[in-house]
Amino acid sequence: MRTGVIMKKSHKDKIVVVGAGNVGEAIAYTLMVRVQANDIVLVDVNEDRAKGAALDIAHGTSFFKQVWVRQGGYEECADAQMIIITAGIARKPGQTRLDLAKTNVSIVKSITENIMKYAKNPLILVVSNPADITTMAVQQVSGLPAERVIGSGTSLDTARFRYILSEKL
């Protein structure tokens, strides 16, 4: 299914976002607004969620030239300039960080196996939590060198901390 508007077809970049939840949708929207790629593909185990998110974002593409937002599958990773993994479950009340890590590591390992079926030497950005552990899992499963697997690290925690401090000061 193709969604979005292309005003002029020229291949700049394709970015695949795996995980069409709140974080994945926000990242795809930001990529569209900043025109970081002219082909943004959302991949999710829940294809309807990915289609809906792609449509929501694509409705704004008429304000930005050369941006195409759509839902797709892992085969889209074959020629992507970057793959961003945002998939994973959110931490539930009472759930330990270790339990979250076990679940999300399992999820990103499966995602990485699917990515590597199609992509030869991808650049992967891991945003799933806990970021350091999931990034290491992606690197181990993919066999990619460290410079091809980038984790968001504690950037989100730092941003949250800065926000809380600004509210208190």
Which residues are covered by each model-predicted region?
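N-terminal Rossmann-fold NAD(P) dinucleotide-binding loop
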Residues: 24-25
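Aromatic pocket-lining residues of Rossmann-like dinucleotide-binding sites
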Residues: 31
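Glycine-rich Rossmann-fold phosphate-binding loop(s) that bind the pyrophosphate
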Residues: 20-21
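Conserved N-terminal Rossmann-fold NAD(P) cofactor-binding segment
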Residues: 43-81, 95
